[in-house]
């Protein structure tokens, strides 16, 4: 389906890489809601936080993974992806930046380390409202169907009623079927931290 020039532009990125199941499900969820442009790392970049590439070339290449979706893989971090999209790839400021769907939770201190959430924060710094989606499942067989459904619902709502241009939403979706999820609850970030264990060799 051809996109009208008035259709909203949705920038999609992540930190798990351009071939990850999370970004594939996110693209499938929202690709008919506007002009979707994907700029994502060419390899996993989890835990990169707000890092940017300095001192070496930053490259991006067009890839064709999903029909009708403009996609680019980037050699840099998730934040690099947002910066490149804004300055070199997109011909206008996107209406929304959507990051994810992350393979694992992003809450409490995780959001500081998370490339998924840092990409969303970078977008908001650049006056692009943003959402970071995460599935609370770390298994290799994670089922993204419920997160795909709720990602679409939330993106649709924000396109209809745009938030402040510096708004960032952090959405964590439980490991349940779409039928079992009763709705969306807005809450503050919890306080928690990891107990690290270093192995000396």
Q: Where are the model-predicted features located?
A:
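A cross-family phosphate/adenosyl-ligand binding-site feature
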Residues: 2-10, 21-88, 92-93
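Alpha-helix C-terminal capping segments
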Residues: 85-91, 118-129
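Short beta-strand segments
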Residues: 13, 39-41, 99-102, 133-134, ...
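Glycine-rich phosphate/pyrophosphate-binding loops
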Residues: 124-146
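Short, Asp-centered acidic motifs that coordinate Mg2+ and/or phosphate
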Residues: 96
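Short, glycine-rich nucleotide/cofactor-binding loops
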Residues: 12-19, 110-111
């Amino acid at each position: 389906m051809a996109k009208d020039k008035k259709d909203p532009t949705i920038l999609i990125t992540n930190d798990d890489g351009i071939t990850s199941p999370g970004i594939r499900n996110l693209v499938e969820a929202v690709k008919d809601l506007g002009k979707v442009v994907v700029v994502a790392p060419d390899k996993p970049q989890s835990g990169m936080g707000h890092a940017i590439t300095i001192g070496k070339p930053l490259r991006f290449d067009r890839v064709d993974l999903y029909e009708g979706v403009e996609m680019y893989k980037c050699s840099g971090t998730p934040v690099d992806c947002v910066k490149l999209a804004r300055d070199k790839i997109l011909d206008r400021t996107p209406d929304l930046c959507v990051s994810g769907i992350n393979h694992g939770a992003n809450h409490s201190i995780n959001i500081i380390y998370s490339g998924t959430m840092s990409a969303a924060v970078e977008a908001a710094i650049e006056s692009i409202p943003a959402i970071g989606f995460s599935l609370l499942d770390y298994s290799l067989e994670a089922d993204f169907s419920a997160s795909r459904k709720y990602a679409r619902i939330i993106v649709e709502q924000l396109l209809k009623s745009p938030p402040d241009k510096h708004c960032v939403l952090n959405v964590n979706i439980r490991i349940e079927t779409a039928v079992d999820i009763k709705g969306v609850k807005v809450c503050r970030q919890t306080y928690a931290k990891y107990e690290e264990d270093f192995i000396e060799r």
